[in-house]
């Protein structure tokens, strides 16, 4: 039995779904590192999808017929990250809460492009708090819709992408088909 099978066995997901889960989160898609195994990276991806990405998309699906919903996907790795990783002695990549360094006065060193990203994110957050619509100079953030399934990818450069472009539509559709975990 593979690592993935062992991890998913605890969720009472029937055997029919195991093959699909292994396909979506096959540890062979990832690289063993000094700090973590391929299984860890597969599990991390699964956890992020099950706990954050897919519930946000599912909630947007439920709420969007009644009011505007704005989803984002933060995927920027800070240029200073290699220095922090040396201190942490582990690769960090993009992790939950990474975007907060752009919103609040966190003592991290940003390059010029990251400063622009920070400025845009602050404008989005403050205009949303003020008006209920996230607006930033030169960047549109469309309301989420079932038909388009678009999110704003916060990165350098920023862009509006479909969940399928970032590999999440197929994953979230699968989890929606079996119900919330």
What is each stretch, according to the model?
Residues 1-115, 124, 131:
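Substrate-gating cap/lid region and adjacent catalytic-acid/histidine neighborhood
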Residues 39-40, 64-69, 77-78, 109-181:
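Alpha/beta-hydrolase-fold serine-hydrolase catalytic core, especially in secreted/extracellular enzymes
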